[in-house]
Amino acid sequence: LSGSEKIYKAHTKFKFVRNRNFEVYGEEKNMIFHYAGKYNGDESSLPYKEHHPNATPFKEPEDTKKLSLIANVGCILIMGILAIPFLILGIEYIPDNAIWMMIGGICGGLSLLPHELLHAICYKKDVYMYNDLAHMLMFVVGTEDMSKGRFIFMCLCPNLILGIIPYILFLIFPQFVGLGLFGIICIGMGFGDYLNIYNAIKQMPKNSKTYLCGMHSYWYL
């Protein structure tokens, strides 16, 4: 293998591949994770597939700049709303938990990578991860077909594990203010996923399937 192609075998039945040329290694039945590096802004450089004859594009933002703007504004709004019960319940615990607040905030800010990895493990075939840190984005792209339910689960998975569950635990045990702050940040960072879930629920008919091609989602019956 060359220096840019390092394969890491996990205990589960998938492999991690660093590969910028979209070559496939290993058995077909294994999910293979490809770290593709920095997104260059050219959608034609992303993985693509031949469109299904009856494919209909999602009505969604056309480029990463518009998407990042919507996602960042939505993120701030959601975190602002969630901060209200956080302050009401946790205000008395914050002074004595400054270190845990700092840890929760730092971990929340660093959760972008595990967030995308949790998206990736929902795929059964090749999935590619890119970073676009100039627009505060990381994203994964996989071109396999998914049912409406699996697509919604894939979008929701990291937000549930990293955000919603920790925040609910804080609501039950408000002394865990660091965990609550972590949950707030992780829930807010998933705003782009909530847009995808909304689009799937609103636009995809019953029994339809969806797939990604470049930056855009399509559905078909």
Segments the model singles out, each with a brief description of its role:
Residues F86-P95:
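Short, hydrophobic transmembrane alpha-helix segments
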Residues L118-D126, I165, A200:
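Active-site-flanking alpha-helical
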Residues S111-K124, P158:
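Active-site recognition of the HExxH zinc-binding catalytic motif
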Residues L1-N30:
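N-terminal amphipathic/basic-hydrophobic helices that include classical n-h-c signal peptides
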Residues I32-F86, L137-L221:
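Metalloprotease/metallohydrolase-associated module, dominated by Zn2+-dependent proteases
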Residues Y128-M136:
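Peri-membrane helix termini and adjoining interfacial loops of integral membrane proteins
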Residues D96-L112:
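Short pre-active-site segment immediately N-terminal to the catalytic Zn-binding motif
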